[in-house]
Amino acid sequence: MQADFWHARWANNQIGFHLDEINPYLMRHLSRLRLQAGERILVPLCGKTLDLAWLAAQGLEVLGVELSEKAVSDFFEEHDLRPEIDQLGGFRRYRVAGITLLQGDFFALQAEHLAQCRAFYDRAALIALPPEMRERYAGHLQAVLPTRSLGLLVTIDYPQAEMAGPPFAVPDEEVRGYYAGGWRIEELERGDVLGVNWKFLERGVSWLNEAVYLLERG
């Protein structure tokens, strides 16, 4: 899956992965990240999610990373914000009070970019990637995060043979394999969500679960 794939999805407005509401799992479980006002949270592959503005409204400093320039521009335009724009290494950096978005390749992130991050929130990053990229993504995320970090991870699982992603099925054992080295993994929620996801029903998926994990690296 190349960068051109995602640029085309945004250019053609094929963004079914974008939610027009704050993610309810985030609202329920943000407190588990034990963040204080002013602390920084990373949102990888953030798109133009409404969660960015909601996190900032909770008093947090939000750092999003997104490949698509259109997604980043749309976010600020739709929130009537006028960001300061400059260059930070290989990233184009957009900044307003409480929110910084780095537009560019996630794999170009370096540890110094995340030095102030206490936690991360992944709702649409891991599940957006095919199997051959997920291990690389999880490995790079862990390599650049500070030593003591927490994470809130949302995944989906379904019979992958019944539908071509994205979003891709990420089973529990895969999550635990990616974060086996030094992370404590707690499953916070798991539930059947097929009935409220008509796109999966239309494509013949027989079951669909969503899971939420708290990750803590000690």
Curated annotation (Swiss-Prot):
It catalyses: S-adenosyl-L-methionine + a thiopurine = S-adenosyl-L-homocysteine + a thiopurine S-methylether. Gene3D superfamilies: Vaccinia Virus protein VP39. Keywords: Cytoplasm, Methyltransferase, S-adenosyl-L-methionine, Transferase. Disulfide bonds: none annotated. Its EC number is 2.1.1.67. The keyword S-adenosyl-L-methionine applies. One of its GO terms (cellular component) is cytoplasm. One of its GO terms (biological process) is response to metal ion. The keyword Cytoplasm applies. One of its GO terms (molecular function) is thiopurine S-methyltransferase activity. S-adenosyl-L-methionine binds at W10, L45, E66, R123. It is found in: Cytoplasm. It is an enzyme of class 2 (transferase). It holds the Pfam family TPMT. Belongs to the class I-like SAM-binding methyltransferase superfamily. TPMT family. HAMAP family: Thiopur_methtran. This is Thiopurine S-methyltransferase. It comes from Pseudomonas aeruginosa (strain UCBPP-PA14). The gene is tpm.
